[in-house]
């Protein structure tokens, strides 16, 4: 009877966590790349659209998704199963169905991590503890209110890889599955390998080394071998994709030797969980609290996967923090497994401490859900204003959101990729400004006078008390794109590097002290003007702005 009660408590606790996760995602509309996945993908880009999509061909059924993903494999990257699911929910099904499915995947994620960290015994406390720990200490909000594309690419892919690790562990322990179970396990292994390179590359490399070791000991063969082969075949499908190879070539292209070396050294400083793992390992080993030989033996596979992921990142250099998710996850997983081996950690893993920790997590998550409902209303209000305005102008009020919620909440910003995505999705250029700029922008004509002209810049005017610049370009057409080049006084290399990482895709670095941002002119009272918001650069000394046709 007691055993059944514990089982029901496990189920109820997991369902409660799943419902909380559902509430988070229920307040997130289609965002960012989700909008692009509503259209058919092509083999190459058309016009100025950064994604190779046909804006005149929205997805009209599952058959279109197959064709679109076939093209996507050649033009974008090799994550075909992942993006098939993304496009299915973005274009064929709807966000409500996705919210239910992703909540179930989140439950599988929690169960999978619990099985890896606590292989022998698990209670409801472990599930709520893992949910709380990942909420506070894992660096990526991609697991939470992140939209369809990010959630499937990262959380779903990671969950598939976690369950593959559990299957592989069972196969290595000698468990023999029946034919139907083996067929299902092979399918899961293949799809997990064909999910996301941030996880699959490390696991595939560790599987290869494990298989060679088994071959040397004449222990190769059996179901563990077939699972490893299936996973590696899936990972190979990721790597050999023409889209992936093209992206790797563009990322790995050496523009400047100093920048190439710095990006590979600098990436190490972003691996915070790795340094925490190394530091704690050293401390516990020196203090005699950890049997390092036993720990290394028990976690050989995970350590190999971690090392291969680090090597993979060092070869590529820093791309973005999302690329580090595999390194951070394996480091964090090993850290949790180490704490479980440390006898004194039982005080940290005490049931009452974990429940108290969960209470803080619950209060914070409920507040985030409340704020997300406000940002969702704001999002649709901005869309309505933008569509109703003849010039595509929209204004965003300043919401008083605590800074510690920023990692869980994504809002529109004037220079974000999402503004461009909305422009493509609705077929109308979007121009988003702070609400305080509205009165200025309604009277643009009054600022196109010599009194507001920027010195030494004949066609450039500045609106006082704002970071807005206006350039009149009567000879251009609305579909033209101009590039504004901002020149700054030299800044330290470290600062330049950090700046380069936080700007979105519309901003490009040119020889360390010059930055370019692409803008499109808008029609205003029968003339074309370019409106430049210099807010992103307000902490720098602006020397000049050069307009040139792109």
What are these regions (language model features)?
Residues 6-81, 90-109, 121-122, 363-550:
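Intrinsically disordered, polar/acidic, low-complexity terminal segments
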Residues 7-21, 127-132, 186-187, 228-233:
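Alpha-helical transmembrane segments
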Residues 8-10, 121-129, 177-182, 220-228, ...:
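Membrane-interfacial loop-to-transmembrane alpha-helix junctions, especially the N-terminal start
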Residues 22-97, 148-152, 189-307, 314-323:
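Transmembrane catalytic cores of multi-pass membrane glycosyltransferases
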Residues 79, 126-169, 196, 271-279, ...:
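Membrane-interface micro-motifs in multi-pass membrane enzymes
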Residues 108-115, 163-170, 206-214, 281-291, ...:
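Transmembrane alpha-helices and membrane-interface helical segments
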Residues 161-182, 216-219:
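Membrane-interface transmembrane helices that cradle and orient dolichyl/undecaprenyl
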Residues 179-182, 303, 341-365:
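Signature aromatic-anchored transmembrane alpha helix within multi-pass, membrane-resident enzymes
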């Amino acid at each position: 009877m007691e055993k059944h009660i514990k089982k029901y408590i496990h189920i109820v606790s997991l369902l409660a966590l799943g419902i909380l996760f559902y509430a988070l995602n229920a307040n997130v509309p289609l965002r960012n790349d989700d909008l692009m996945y509503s259209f058919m993908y092509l083999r190459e880009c058309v016009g100025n659209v950064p994604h190779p999509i046909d804006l005149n061909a929205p997805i009209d059924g599952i058959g279109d998704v197959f064709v679109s993903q076939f093209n996507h494999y050649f033009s974008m990257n090799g994550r075909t199963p992942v993006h098939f699911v993304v496009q299915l929910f973005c274009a064929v099904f709807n966000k409500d169905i996705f919210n239910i499915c992703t909540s179930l995947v989140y439950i599988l994620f929690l169960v999978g991590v619990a099985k890896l960290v606590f292989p022998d015994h698990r209670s409801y406390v472990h599930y709520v503890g893992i949910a709380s720990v990942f909420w506070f200490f894992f660096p990526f909000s991609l697991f939470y209110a992140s939209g369809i594309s990010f959630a499937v690419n990262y959380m779903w892919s990671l969950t598939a890889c976690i369950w593959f690790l559990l299957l592989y562990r069972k196969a290595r322990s000698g468990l023999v599955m029946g034919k139907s179970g083996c067929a299902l396990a092979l399918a899961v292994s293949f799809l997990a390998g064909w999910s996301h390179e941030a996880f699959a590359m490390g696991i595939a490399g560790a599987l290869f080394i494990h298989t060679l070791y088994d071959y040397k000991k004449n222990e190769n063969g059996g179901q563990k071998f077939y699972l490893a082969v299936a996973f590696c075949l899936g990972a190979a499908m990721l790597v050999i994709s023409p889209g992936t190879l093209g992206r790797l070539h563009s990322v790995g292209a050496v523009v400047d030797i100093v920048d190439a070396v710095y990006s590979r050294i600098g990436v190490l400083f972003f691996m915070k969980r790795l340094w925490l793992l190394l530091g704690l390992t050293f401390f516990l080993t020196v203090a005699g609290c950890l049997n390092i030989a036993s720990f290394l033996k028990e976690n050989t596979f995970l350590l190999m996967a971690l090392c291969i992921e680090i090597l993979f990142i060092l070869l590529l250099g820093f791309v973005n923090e999302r690329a580090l998710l595999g390194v951070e996850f394996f480091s964090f997983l090993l850290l949790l497994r180490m704490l479980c081996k440390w006898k004194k950690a039982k005080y940290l893993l005490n049931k009452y401490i974990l429940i108290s920790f969960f209470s803080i997590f619950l209060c914070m998550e409920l507040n985030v859900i409340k704020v997300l409902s406000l940002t969702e209303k704001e999002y649709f209000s901005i869309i309505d204003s933008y569509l109703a305005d003849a010039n595509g102008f929209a204004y965003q009020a300043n919401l008083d959101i605590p800074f510690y919620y920023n990692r869980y909440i994504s809002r529109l910003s004037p220079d974000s990729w999402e503004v461009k995505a909305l422009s493509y999705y609705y077929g109308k250029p979007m121009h988003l400004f702070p609400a305080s700029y509205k009165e200025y922008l309604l009277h643009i004509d009054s600022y196109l006078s010599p009194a507001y002209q920027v010195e030494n810049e004949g066609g450039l005017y500045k609106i006082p008390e704002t970071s807005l610049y206006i350039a009149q370009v009567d000879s251009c057409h609305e579909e033209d794109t101009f590039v504004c080049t901002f020149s700054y006084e030299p800044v330290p290399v470290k600062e330049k590097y950090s700046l380069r990482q936080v700007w979105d895709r519309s901003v490009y670095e040119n020889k360390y002290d010059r930055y370019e941002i692409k803008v499109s002119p808008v029609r205003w009272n029968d003339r074309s003007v370019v409106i430049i918001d210099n807010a992103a650069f307000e902490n720098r000394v602006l020397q000049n702005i050069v307009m040139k046709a792109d």
